[in-house]
Amino acid sequence: PMGGDAYYLMREGTLSGTALEPRHAELLLVTVLASDYSNWTSVHMDGARRAGASEAEIAEAVLCAVPVAGLSAWVVGATAMDAGKN
């Protein structure tokens, strides 16, 4: 429980009250997580949508992962995008 509380506070501190708009912070997290082939990519895609990001912006964020992580990053991102549309 304490670890979860600490993580939540850290996450809120990095996604709100910063120079980046929440939409941009979520899109950056989509790029980073897609490049790491993380299952959490979809969570931040949902966050980006809630913050006002378009599907085109989310796709662009995934594409930014491809040069450093390869086409596998696109597979992770495309799968997460498809799941988020349902």
What are the language-model segments listed below?
Residues 1-24, 45-50, 74-86:
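Acidic, glycine/proline-rich low-complexity segments that act as flexible tails and inter-domain linkers
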Residues 21-27, 56-60:
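Alpha-helical scaffolds flanking conserved acidic
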Residues 24-39:
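Amphipathic, charged-and-aliphatic alpha-helical interface segments
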Residues 31-32, 44, 62:
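Buried hydrophobic packing segments
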Residues 34-37, 64-71:
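A short structural micro-motif
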Residues 38-59:
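Mid-chain, well-packed structural core segment of small domains
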Residues 40, 60, 70-73, 77:
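Short linear functional motifs in flexible/disordered or boundary regions
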Residues 57-66, 78-85:
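Hydrophobic transmembrane alpha-helix bundles
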